[in-house]
Amino acid sequence: MDWLQLFFLHPLSFYQGAAFPFALLFNYLCILDTFSTRARYLFLLAGGGVLAFAAMGPYSLLIFIPALCAVALVSFLSPQEVHRLTFFFQMGWQTLCHLGLHYTEYYLGEPPPVRFYITLSSLMLLTQRVTSLSLDICEGKVEAPRRGIRSKSSFSEHLWDALPHFSYLLFFPALLGGSLCSFRRFQACVQRSSSLYPSISFRALTWRGLQILGLECLKVALRSAVSAGAGLDDCQRLECIYLMWSTAWLFKLTYYSHWILDDSLLHAAGFGAEAGQGPGEEGYVPDVDIWTLETTHRISLFARQWNRSTALWLRRLVFRKSRRWPLLQTFAFSAWWHGLHPGQVFGFLCWSVMVKADYLIHTFANVCIRSWPLRLLYRALTWAHTQLIIAYIMLAVEGRSLSSLCQLCCSYNSLFPVMYGLLLFLLAERKDKRN
């Protein structure tokens, strides 16, 4: 087994690993009394700029330009209008970049550069931070930089005043991945006194490293099993189900490994869960809880726990503000945020229907199923069904293209979401009659 190829096969893993020593250095410098708060902001910002240029090359401009514009917007707009205008600018910019990917993939039929994929991934994370910051300002939780037009301060003072916001948008531990950190938590971590700054827990980092090693070994074993089988276009019945489940497991193992690596980088820099939570600070939200994701029999719980910080961001940004069809609007926006590929649109809309069905099915079961043997059987069956439906959705989203989506829809695997869809129709009709 080529271990070097195993751990650095994905470019994001390579660049996240390359940033690790600098995260440890930042943590060490913060313990020193001579490392001022302004120096911390500059270190994080400079590290983000260097990492962006190293990972994205000339495409890094697609990150720097919206970050600069976002800081300008939050500096000069009033709190009442800052979120709306910032949101539409950021999503418009991201959509244009995704349309460039569509043009290259579907019209030209050429594979886009790897650096462009990394840029789009980082741009999606930047959108999270920009909209989170603008929401905080709009809700009065965070103060915007002083208004340049109304203030008589010099231009350099305005730049220093905007430094925390600019550093937040581009700080290197979260540039390429990681749980969404609010501006308030980011500011509290950076401004924490040297005596209160958390020391590096090498035991926690070692444990995360062992988890990544185990996940990567599982990926190698599963990849060999998947590659030896048939494809979705020529599989038959149970073989199609096994192929879908094992391929989805490959995707999940990749996500788990990346999320743990991202969490390790944030921890090494002092922004992880081990940093604790002081008065007025927001808690750290990890993206992955493997045990909950793999043992739950509820599709709705899986949706809330999968990429948890993003799920909370979508809930705050879309779900709570939607007056009609909040669930559908949330998943539709998620498809827009991911790039509006055919498989993504179908996958996320299917997911919203499955979550709605999940609520009705489990509400009905809690009333009708009383004995514990039947409850145990029900839980086992719904767990298996949940895992297979999630695998179906994952293949649709990750396949992206229309041809891959057609292969998936024409396979026997479509039986599982169709079954939940029929139950949704029957239970919704029963609920309407009772009302």
Swiss-Prot record:
Reported impact of residue 356 to R: Does not affect protein cleavage
Membrane topology category: Multi-pass membrane protein
InterPro entries in the record: LPLAT_7/PORCN-like, MBOAT_fam
Leading EC class: transferase
Thermal dependence of catalysis: Optimum temperature is 37-50 degrees Celsius.
Entry GO CC: endoplasmic reticulum; endoplasmic reticulum membrane
Stretches that traverse the bilayer: 6-26, 41-56, 60-76, 83-101, 121-136, 207-227, 241-261, 325-338, 341-357, 377-397, 408-428
One family name in Pfam for this protein: MBOAT
GO molecular function: acyltransferase activity, transferring groups other than amino-acyl groups; serine O-acyltransferase activity
Expression tissues: Highly expressed in stomach and pancreas. Lower expression in small intestine and colon. Very low expression in testis.
pH dependence: Optimum pH is 7.0-7.5.
Phenotype for residue 338 to N: Does not affect protein cleavage
Consequence recorded when altering residue 181 to A: No effect on ability to acylate ghrelin
Statement: the UniProt record of this protein carries the keyword Endoplasmic reticulum: yes
Effect of deleting the gene: Mice display a complete lack of octanoylated ghrelin in blood.
PTM note: Not glycosylated.
Protein purpose: Catalyzes ghrelin acylation at 'Ser-3' using preferentially octanoyl-CoA, hexanoyl-CoA and decanoyl-CoA as acyl-CoA donors leading to ghrelin activity. In vitro also uses acyl-CoA donors of different lengths from short-chain (C2) to long-chain fatty acids (C16) knowing that acyl-CoA donors from butanoyl-CoA (C4) to dodecanoyl-CoA (C12) are more efficient compared to longer acyl-CoA donors, such as myristoyl-CoA (C14) and palmitoyl-CoA (C16) that are not efficient.
Name of this chain's protein: Membrane-bound ghrelin O-acyltransferase MBOAT4
UniProt source species: Mus musculus (Mouse)
Lineage of source species: Eukaryota, Metazoa, Chordata, Craniata, Vertebrata
